[in-house]
Amino acid sequence: MTILSAITSISRPNKSSKSVVSSNGGSSLSMGSNSVSCFNACGGGSSYSYSSSYSGSGLDYSYKANYSSSNGYNSSVVIASSTCHCS
């Protein structure tokens, strides 16, 4: 992610961003740099929601992951695009 796109993600947290969300061992969700952007966009608070969806090759599905600093997050889904919302 370039600095410009990172700044854009931070300043416009509810806009869809094209970053890959990948599962890690089927139990831990790795949201990469976009997770950091979402966290920063929400002021570094304790929680935020991260909604993702993917459409392609005849497959349409959506997924929503909630992150909490105390509980962490988990998932086993790989998704291609996402939107974060401060809570």
Swiss-Prot record:
GO biological process per UniProt: sorocarp development
InterPro entries: HssA/B-like_chaperone, HssA/B-related
Composition skew (Low complexity), residue ranges: 14-31
Residues annotated as signal peptide: none
Superkingdom of origin organism: Eukaryota
Comp. bias intervals (Polar residues): 1-13
Chain residue ranges for the region called Disordered: 1-31
Entry similarity comment: Belongs to the hssA/B family.
PANTHER family: HSSA/B-LIKE PROTEIN 1-RELATED-RELATED, HSSA_B-LIKE PROTEIN 1-RELATED
Name used for this protein in its record: HssA/B-like protein 55
Species in which this protein is naturally found: Dictyostelium discoideum
